[in-house]
């Protein structure tokens, strides 16, 4: 019964907020607010604009390193486990691998898209 009351309350509150959002007037409707923004590019222009391949490679490299760093996020909870030596060793090895990958990208000039 308690679950049903909670679900009913949540549904009613959500419906009430949606109805209020539809009834409230849209003030300050500027053309800049209603037009789409595409990272500085004109969204209504040609889709065949030249694109820097070096910038694309830097963006992909950033995504890879960002995802690998995300593997370290559960580390504070993993340290509380019984076998902390193995956890710290594996996380240290991951950091070393990331540093080697970053050094390789730097030496290969993969982080420069201006040239």
UniProtKB/Swiss-Prot annotation:
It is an enzyme of class 7 (translocase). It is found in: Mitochondrion inner membrane. It is a multi-pass membrane protein. Gene3D superfamilies: NADH:ubiquinone/plastoquinone oxidoreductase, chain 3. Keywords: Electron transport, Extinct organism protein, Membrane, Mitochondrion, Mitochondrion inner membrane, NAD, Respiratory chain, Translocase, Transmembrane, Transmembrane helix, Transport, Ubiquinone. The chain crosses the membrane at residues 3-23, 55-75, 86-106. Its EC number is 7.1.1.2. One of its GO terms (biological process) is mitochondrial electron transport, NADH to ubiquinone. GO terms for cellular component: mitochondrial inner membrane; NADH dehydrogenase complex. Pfam families: Oxidored_q4 (PF00507). It catalyses: a ubiquinone + NADH + 5 H(+)(in) = a ubiquinol + NAD(+) + 4 H(+)(out). Core subunit of the mitochondrial membrane respiratory chain NADH dehydrogenase (Complex I) which catalyzes electron transfer from NADH through the respiratory chain, using ubiquinone as an electron acceptor. Essential for the catalytic activity of complex I. Core subunit of respiratory chain NADH dehydrogenase (Complex I) which is composed of 45 different subunits. Interacts with TMEM186. Interacts with TMEM242. This is NADH-ubiquinone oxidoreductase chain 3.
């Amino acid at each position: 019964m308690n679950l049903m009351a909670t679900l009913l309350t949540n549904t009613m509150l959500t419906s009430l907020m949606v109805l209020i959002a539809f009834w409230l007037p849209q003030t300050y409707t500027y053309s800049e607010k209603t037009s789409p923004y595409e990272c500085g590019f004109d969204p209504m222009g040609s889709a065949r604009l030249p694109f820097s391949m070096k910038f694309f490679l830097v963006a992909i490299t950033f995504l890879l390193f960002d995802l690998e760093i995300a593997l370290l996020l559960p580390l504070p909870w993993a340290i509380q486990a019984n076998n902390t030596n193995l956890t710290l060793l594996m996380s240290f090895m991951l950091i070393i691998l990331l540093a080697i990958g970053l050094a390789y990208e730097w030496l290969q000039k993969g982080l420069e898209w201006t040239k």
